[in-house]
């Protein structure tokens, strides 16, 4: 799966924060149907990646701290620790026994080209566009 549950939950958390207000983890979890323990884990990553700001205490909560127009789906996936790779041989440093024995692998070359196109597409999609949608969900030309 290219978009994992963790990325999906991160997107849901950001969707709640679109209004610019502070929200509690409990509120976000309930609204977006995210288990509390996952919400806390993901918020730690989003905070470390400077996408959200977390404040503690009686007046605490979570708020958006990034420009959603300048942050891409690819960026978000990196923050949560995912690359969205098509297959294991796309991983940096992957050692392929088949290539070691036979040389150039046409399958790898084709998959690498697809991986590059996918990465470019994910970089081209701003989080704001992804989270707010459009009038026609089938139209991805503006993504």
Where is each model-derived feature located?
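N-terminal helix-turn-helix DNA-binding core of bacterial DNA-binding proteins
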Residues: 3-34
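Solvent-exposed interaction patches of small proteins and small membrane subunits
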Residues: 25, 31, 56, 65, ...
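Basic amphipathic alpha-helical segments that dock to polyanions
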Residues: 28, 42-49
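Key DNA-contact positions within bacterial/archaeal DNA-binding proteins
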Residues: 37
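Beta-hairpin "wing" of winged helix-turn-helix
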Residues: 49-65
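Non-DNA-binding regulatory cores of transcription-related proteins
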Residues: 65-143
